[in-house]
């Protein structure tokens, strides 16, 4: 099932070595982890909403997420310190490659009017962050059973030193880029 892990080991490492001519195999960039974050602002008014977000993220990632808490109170938003305001999950190793494969092959083609990712989404240190507006692009989510459509932020953390190396690495996994 882990075709993306095999793809990395058999082809992407070789292509990176040819392109950047690393001296050691430990210099070759790899994906360290994928962090999926779902902020749930509605949880301030209704604390049960956070359970639905946790269930959605569990189905999407295959791993139980951690509930995130507010760090400080903000009176304008009626937010108190340590209120539940979201959830996140960190994927590593096999689950990370499994999620990346489902994201590229199944979920991204289902996003409406999706042309690809901008190169501006890199942070300068080789990490790539993007957002999805709907959780229903994943086939694990049943449209009839969700309470509301929620978005999520996905961060792909790599060991690449530069954005150029990271772009080359992620392009090897067929992540669509434009520009």
Curated annotation (Swiss-Prot):
Cellular component, GO annotation: ribonucleoprotein complex; ribosome
Database matches in PROSITE patterns: RIBOSOMAL_L5 (PS00358)
InterPro entries referenced in this protein's UniProt entry, alphabetically: Ribosomal_uL5, Ribosomal_uL5_bac-type, Ribosomal_uL5_C, Ribosomal_uL5_CS, Ribosomal_uL5_dom_sf, Ribosomal_uL5_N
Pfam families: Ribosomal_L5, Ribosomal_L5_C
SUPFAM superfamilies linked: RL5-like (SSF55282)
Lineage: superkingdom: Bacteria
Residue ranges the record marks as coiled coil: none
Known role: This is one of the proteins that bind and probably mediate the attachment of the 5S RNA into the large ribosomal subunit, where it forms part of the central protuberance. In the 70S ribosome it contacts protein S13 of the 30S subunit (bridge B1b), connecting the 2 subunits; this bridge is implicated in subunit movement. Contacts the P site tRNA; the 5S rRNA and some of its associated proteins might help stabilize positioning of ribosome-bound tRNAs.
Identification of the protein by name: Large ribosomal subunit protein uL5
Highest classification ranks of the organism: Bacteria, Pseudomonadati, Pseudomonadota, Alphaproteobacteria, Rickettsiales
Gene name for this UniProt entry: rplE
């Amino acid at each position: 099932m882990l075709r993306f892990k095999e793809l990395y080991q058999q082809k992407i490492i070789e292509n990176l070595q040819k392109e950047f001519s690393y001296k050691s195999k430990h210099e070759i960039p790899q994906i360290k982890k994928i962090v999926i974050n779902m902020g749930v602002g509605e949880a301030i008014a209704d604390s049960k909403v956070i359970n639905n977000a946790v269930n959605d993220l569990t189905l999407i990632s295959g791993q139980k997420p951690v509930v995130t808490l507010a760090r400080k109170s903000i009176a304008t938003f009626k937010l108190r310190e340590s209120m539940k305001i979201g959830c996140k999950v960190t994927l590593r190793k096999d689950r990370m490659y499994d999620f990346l494969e489902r994201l590229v092959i199944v979920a991204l083609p289902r996003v409406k009017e999706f042309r690809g990712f901008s190169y501006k989404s890199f942070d300068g240190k080789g990490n790539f962050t993007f957002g999805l507006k709907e959780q229903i692009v994943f086939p694990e989510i049943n449209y009839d059973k969700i309470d509301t459509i929620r978005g999520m932020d996905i961060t792909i953390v790599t060991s690449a030193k530069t954005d150029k190396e990271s772009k080359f690495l992620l392009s090897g996994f067929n992540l669509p880029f434009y520009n």
